[in-house]
Amino acid sequence: MTLYKGGLSRAECSAMRGVAILGIVLHNYSHWLKMAVKENEYTFIQSNADGIWNAITNVSWYLPIHLLSFFGHYGVPVFLFLSAYGLTLKYEAPQESAWEFIRKHFAKLFMMMIYGFALFLMVDRIVDGPHKYHMMDIVGQLGLFNNLLPDPDHVIWPGPYWFFGLMMQLYIVYRLLLYRRHWGITVGLMAVCFLLQCFCDPQGDALNRLRYNFVGGMLPFAMGLLYARYERGLKQWQYALLAVVSLLLIVGWSMEYQAWFWVPAAVCVFAVAMVKITPKRINDILVWVGGISSAMFVCHPITRKIFITISRHGDIYTGLLMYIVA
């Protein structure tokens, strides 16, 4: 079996995690504000796309909020890309049973999730506007299968914790279908997942359910796997060109339904290119942030619940700054 070396250093991977977690954390705060342009994450709403274009072309004091609200969730595809990248480098040479692999990664996700979930349940009851849980909602979160339950928009709480169920599904798909398999299997699964989505109603429940589960995350995950196997490296000017082109594609593809499915691919290309060309001083900061990304992800729904009321009462950037500091 080939030992893949990959094209990203540990520091570059950590810097990408830093960028991704900042996007996710700031998005999850910003999109709770009524004035913010809402994202197209699980479904595609044309008015949201039109709204961000209007915000970009008519710059206001709140443009950063609009950009974070609309684009920040694309930190998730970067994490999926890096997860597959790391799995390929770490596990494709050693032999390990499918059951042992799945058991170990379930335990890893559960231990990362449970402390934040337990604390959030307490904070949620204390702070105004507590969520009404049903028993199956909690069981689904503890079992990391709540993405599969009906109406995931209202079942999964805190909302960002849908990522744990998504990652568990992708771990299973990787080990059972993609582990040490021909690249054609990976590309074929990407194509199947795309076709399952592209014929759906842009605002329909079917698309919403698919994108809460591994079907919606397959593109960046598969890209990470293939990149780990076949990346050969580029020159600095080529990475710079890729960064510019991919950034333009992120914005352009976000405006049209069928093109929107490919935005995560452009986001992953942009993230890789940026860490390759970003000055070391900035990358060092991102590496540090990436090192605490797991803690930030687990804790940020709790701090959001506490500080969001400040921004909702008019002090938008004051609340956001307190949220960042906390």
Locate predicted features.
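Interfacial loop-to-helix transition and helix-capping segments at the boundaries
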Residues: A11, L63-V76, P152-L166, C200-M223, ...
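Hydrophobic alpha-helical segments of polytopic membrane proteins
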Residues: Y179-V192, L226-L249
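Hydrophobic transmembrane alpha-helices
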Residues: F81, Y85-E92, L170-L178, P220-R232, ...
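Short, aromatic-rich membrane-interface segments at the entry and exit
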Residues: Y133, H182-G188, R209-V215, K235-L241, ...
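Aromatic-anchored segments of alpha-helical transmembrane domains
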Residues: L22-Y29, L142-L148, M190-Q203, L242-E256, ...
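Alpha-helical transmembrane segments of multi-pass integral membrane proteins
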Residues: S246-A326
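Membrane-cytosol interface segments of multi-pass membrane proteins
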Residues: M1-C193, H313-A326
